[in-house]
């Protein structure tokens, strides 16, 4: 640095500041998008049951239908993202603004239905319609946001930085959304969401703009293009195994805290430790990318996850502090799951010459698989637990053992399988560092 002289040091500092500002401007949209996702998944069912007396069984059917629709339409949203990213800057930002507005209106309509639609079948129909509107807008914006980074020039480290800014904002949104509805209510939450969307849209206007590659026509051949690449299929298999391993503990967390630890009401503290440590770990994982690369870095994160999480299998009633440490260590490992998969997918897109202009199609299928993870986790592990004798709120010794195995051991086994699958994938496809 001394050899550069004061002007050189100042130039480097200025360049770093510009890079951080660009990363912030790009990543900011992650906050309101995560802000929308958490209340929809966590708060909406209880809100409808408590405020409007909706049947939980009927709400469950509505949510199942909407989530199936959401997962199925993600590849089409990927096409829409490719089309949008092929537009000129002003038109692109206009449509992004429209998407933000539709998202806010859907969220507002969902939590504040008109008085004439607050009972019986009318309420369920309104809920279904608003969920469809909200999910479509959410998927279109989130897939476009992901594909945006993939169209920015740069190699593995550059892509990891864009993704880290996006995921850091996402984690901030998760933490904010986990607290605000219960503390300030849905009116304040909706107002904050509107402000966050507006500010994120303004920030995105000043972010580095994606490379325009020309518009693509909607054909099945174009939508199916990602599946023709063996590298994509292999990486998606790793992503599915790893994602199910992460989704199972998320599905069972409340049961584990309430019945195994006997610490009801402390799940917020555990989640906060998990997500805060994940956010704090992102700069560290960026250094790992620079040192050993994306594939080896993700494998390291998987091993850290297994090493930190396996201990949860032996916890019992009152083991609050050991579990808090496990959550913190697992959060550090989560940073790898956030920082590495998307840049690896961006590399696959770069190496597949036939995929120019189809980044959205790739991320559409990728998001669909991510939603499939959650569905598979719930659909497989909950019936299995019931079959093994676990009953929430009335656990037997056999049921608690089954809960511990399902919560901690099964995810670790799946993580190790994902590690093995990634090791095999890297032998053939991990060519670019």
List each language-model region with its residue ranges.
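Membrane-embedded alpha-helical bundles of multi-pass transporters/translocases
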Residues: 8-433
């Amino acid at each position: 640095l001394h050899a550069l002289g004061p002007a050189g040091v100042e130039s480097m500092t200025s360049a770093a500041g510009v890079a951080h500002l660009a990363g912030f401007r790009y990543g900011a949209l992650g906050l309101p998008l995560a802000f929308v996702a958490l209340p929809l998944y966590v708060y909406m069912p209880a809100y409808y049951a408590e405020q409007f007396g909706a049947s939980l069984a009927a709400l469950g059917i509505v949510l199942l239908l909407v989530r199936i629709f959401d997962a199925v339409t993600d590849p089409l949203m990927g096409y829409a993202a490719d089309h949008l990213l092929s537009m000129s800057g002003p038109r692109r930002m206009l449509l992004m603004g429209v998407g933000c507005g539709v998202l806010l209106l859907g969220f507002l309509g969902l939590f504040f239905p008109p008085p004439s639609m607050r009972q019986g079948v009318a309420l369920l129909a309104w809920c279904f319609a608003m969920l469809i509107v909200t999910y479509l807008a959410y998927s279109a914006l989130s897939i476009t946001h992901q594909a945006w980074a993939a169209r920015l020039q740069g190699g593995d480290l550059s892509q990891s930085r864009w993704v880290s800014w996006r995921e850091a904002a996402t984690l901030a949104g998760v933490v904010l959304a986990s607290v605000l509805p219960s503390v300030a209510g849905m009116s304040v939450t909706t107002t904050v969401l509107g402000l966050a969307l507006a500010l994120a849209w303004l920030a995105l206007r000043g972010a580095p703009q994606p490379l325009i590659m020309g518009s693509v026509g909607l054909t099945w051949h174009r939508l199916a293009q990602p599946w023709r690449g063996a590298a994509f299929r292999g990486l998606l298999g790793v992503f599915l195994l790893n994602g199910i391993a992460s989704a199972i503990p998320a599905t069972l967390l409340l049961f584990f805290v309430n019945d195994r630890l006997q610490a009801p009401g402390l799940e917020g503290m555990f989640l906060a430790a998990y997500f805060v440590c994940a956010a704090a770990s992102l700069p560290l994982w960026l250094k790992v990318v620079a040192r050993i690369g994306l594939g080896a870095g993700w494998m390291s994160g998987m091993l850290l996850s297994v090493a930190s999480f396996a201990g949860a299998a032996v916890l019992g009633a009152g083991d609050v502090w050991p579990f808090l440490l496990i959550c913190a260590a697992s959060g550090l490992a989560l940073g790898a799951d956030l920082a590495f998969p998307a840049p690896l997918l961006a590399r696959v897109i770069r190496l597949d010459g036939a995929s120019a202009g189809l980044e959205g199609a790739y991320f559409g299928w990728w998001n669909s698989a991510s939603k499939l993870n959650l569905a598979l986790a719930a659909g497989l592990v909950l019936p299995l637990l019931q079959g093994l004798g676990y009953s929430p709120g009335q656990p037997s010794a056999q049921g608690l053992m089954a809960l511990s195995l399902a919560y901690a051991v099964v995810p670790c086994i799946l993580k190790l399988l994902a590690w093995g699958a990634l090791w095999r994938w890297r032998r053939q496809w991990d060519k670019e560092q």
